[in-house]
Amino acid sequence: GVDEVWRIGGAQAIAALAYGTDRIAPVDVVTGPGNAWVAEAKRQLYGVVGIDMVAGPSEILVIADGENDPAIVAADLLSQAEHDPTSQSILITDSADLARNVEDAVKVQAAALTTRKAAEASWNDHGVIITVADLADAVPLANRLAAEHLQLSVAEPEALFARIRHAGSVFLGRHTPEAVGDYIAGPNHVLPTGRRARFSSGLSVLDFMKRTSFIQLDQASLAKVGPAAVRLAEEEGLPAHAESVRRRLDA
């Protein structure tokens, strides 16, 4: 359980946890999101401590069919755009009408937000709407983008989901907005960004676990595998390695 709580933040907090202070004992693992300074501090201190990931700007990819309400899709895109001017919101749809209507709705809704400055900057610089002939064509793009958040706002989301290989978290169906995942749905929303979902997963208890291998040989077992170890060590030019095995074989 939790036995210490410290109210600290920023890159200096990451340094304090990694190296320790006169009041804070150094830790082994640092996890969780933060701003660009926190992300860079975690990157630089990886090796001194373990980290979960280096999280970048937030991302959302929405795959939507023509049956969606454009205003709702626009709201989903802006839910990430309002985070930061460097956030990215992408829509892939098979409906040209939806694409046009969503583009118009984004402009109207963004202008009314208290987070307008960040949302408009994000959408203008990083917002993308892509039209495809068939929603099946969206899957290779989604796997290539490996987005932090992937919304499948389609009639049969399970069919597309079965072909998704790379995404931080997937939200199935028109009634599953990404914002619910941020706050109350259950799965952790500390997720890989910047296409890192190709090789990493969201924060979980596994980030606080590790494995230790162990080996035990008896004399008979060493007699079987030892000569191969000797040969490999000699080929690698490491005679002391070979000798540590050979002496046991000759004993």
Regions found by a protein language model. Give the residues of each.
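Conserved NAD(P)+-binding/catalytic subdomain of aldehyde/semialdehyde dehydrogenases
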Residues: 1-90
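C-terminal core of ALDH-fold dehydrogenases
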Residues: 135, 143-251
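Phosphate- and divalent-cation-binding pockets in alpha/beta enzyme and binding domains
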Residues: 16, 40, 72, 101, ...
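Oxyanion/phosphate-interacting regions
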Residues: 49, 104, 251
